[in-house]
């Protein structure tokens, strides 16, 4: 058994005291290597939460070293909301709201982050995670769709409640005919027409269907197109069409049930490996903060736990890039308290003059991606070079925030 029952139960009591609930919508996907343009499996989590300050942490005190996204106020890093480990195992989740049976009176809840941290610490494969779910004492204190990939091509969802789970193997053509599955905030095994995120699911499904028609699914599609999609599948609206003329033309629109939301705190894609590659080439493409006001930073596991400082908590406990992304987010959402999360100023985000916040920061991201892909190509052909990872992170710290500030003329 992965963890003795008495210790697990004691840990639950501690977490119930400290827990920050994930109880808001998320949009997620698991993609088999069979459906990707390079044969590497992918995880996507567009994270929605009440805790908008997120940071990245390196863990090294268990069986496997790993990198994970945590809530900034979680000072002891009890919960991880998406991540990967040195064995090439990656995990994320979306909260579900239709999986519990009507007779489930369990009091403990919202332990998904605890379970995922435990999995990253102990699991190397999809099968390891399944065994962990079986062995852990019940009730688990969860209601979630867990998505996992591993270094052997494994890719699956586990729709999990307090006592049971159902596995969806994304490599099985009978389950995932196109090689991918999507989950928002309901489970396919749960109560019909219950839960949340049906519109977001339809939007994401449309994006994936169009992408697979044109070819294979890439990590770029997952990290660029999905979390930043301004299409609303129910109203047939696309905010990226017919843009306002100028940043001065205030153009507030109702902003609910899009994939990016006011409550979106991060978007992360874990890109796995081919079976002949080192698990250390697993890459976590990470956007801290609102995806339309932040940039993607790639992460790899360094032996000494090095990470970009702009993604780690500083003396305030917050990650500098997340702070900046939230500052820029304030420029595009309504300043009126009772309308704040419901209305977005499209002209401040994008306009025909290309002076919107998103339009100004994209060149910074493009520079990062160009540098990262060049490094990855080299490492995949000749092996990972530890010192080059550290140099890349140093370059990120030296340039990214400075370049964003320069583009937007923000004074430090």
Q: Model-found features: residue ranges?
A:
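Bacterial N-terminal signal peptides that target proteins for export
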Residues: 2-10
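Intrinsic disorder/low-complexity signature
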Residues: 4, 16-17, 394
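C-terminal, well-structured catalytic/ligand-binding subdomain of enzymes
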Residues: 27-78, 82-84, 89, 93-121, ...
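Intrinsically disordered, low-complexity linker/loop segments enriched in Gly/Pro
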Residues: 110-144
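Bacterial N-terminal signal peptides
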Residues: 10-19
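Boundary at the C-terminal end of the N-terminal hydrophobic targeting segment
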Residues: 23-25
């Amino acid at each position: 058994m992965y963890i003795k029952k008495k210790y697990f139960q004691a840990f639950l009591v501690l977490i119930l005291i400290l827990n920050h609930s994930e109880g808001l919508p998320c949009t997620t996907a698991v993609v088999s290597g069979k459906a990707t343009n390079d044969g590497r499996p992918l995880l996507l989590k567009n994270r929605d939460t009440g805790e908008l300050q997120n940071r990245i942490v390196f863990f090294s005190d268990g069986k496997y070293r790993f990198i994970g996204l945590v809530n900034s106020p979680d000072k002891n890093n009890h919960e991880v909301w998406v991540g990967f480990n040195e064995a090439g195992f990656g995990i994320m989740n979306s909260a579900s709201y239709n999986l519990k049976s009507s007779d489930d009176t369990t009091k403990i809840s919202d332990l998904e982050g605890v379970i995922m941290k435990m999995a990253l610490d102990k699991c190397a494969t999809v099968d390891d995670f399944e065994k962990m779910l079986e062995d852990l004492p019940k009730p688990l204190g969860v209601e979630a769709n867990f998505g996992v990939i591993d270094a052997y091509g494994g890719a699956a969802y586990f729709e999990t409640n307090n006592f049971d789970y159902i596995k969806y193997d994304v490599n099985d053509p009978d389950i995932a005919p196109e090689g991918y599955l999507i989950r928002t905030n309901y489970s396919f095994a749960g109560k019909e027409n219950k839960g949340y995120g049906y519109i977001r699911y339809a939007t994401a499904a449309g994006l994936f269907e169009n992408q697979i028609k044109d070819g294979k699914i890439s990590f770029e599609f997952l990290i660029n197109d999905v979390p930043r999609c301004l299409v609303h599948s129910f109203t047939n609206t696309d905010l990226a069409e017919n843009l306002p003329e100028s940043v001065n033309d205030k153009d507030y629109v109702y902003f609910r049930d899009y994939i990016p939301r006011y409550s979106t705190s991060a978007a992360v894609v874990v890109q796995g490996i081919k079976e002949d590659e080192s698990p250390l080439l697993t890459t976590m493409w990470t956007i801290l903060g609102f995806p339309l006001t932040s940039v993607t930073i790639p992460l790899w596991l360094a032996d000494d736990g090095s990470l970009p400082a702009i993604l780690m908590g500083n003396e305030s406990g917050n990650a500098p890039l997340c702070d900046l992304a939230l500052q820029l987010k304030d420029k595009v959402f309504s300043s009126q308290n009772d309308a704040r999360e419901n209305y977005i100023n499209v002209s401040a985000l994008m306009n025909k003059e290309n002076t919107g916040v998103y339009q100004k920061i994209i060149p910074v991201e493009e520079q990062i991606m160009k540098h990262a892909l060049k490094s990855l190509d080299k490492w995949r052909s000749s092996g990972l070079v530890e010192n080059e990872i550290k140099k890349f992170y140093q370059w990120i710290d030296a340039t990214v925030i400075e370049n964003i500030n320069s583009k937007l003329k923000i004074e430090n």
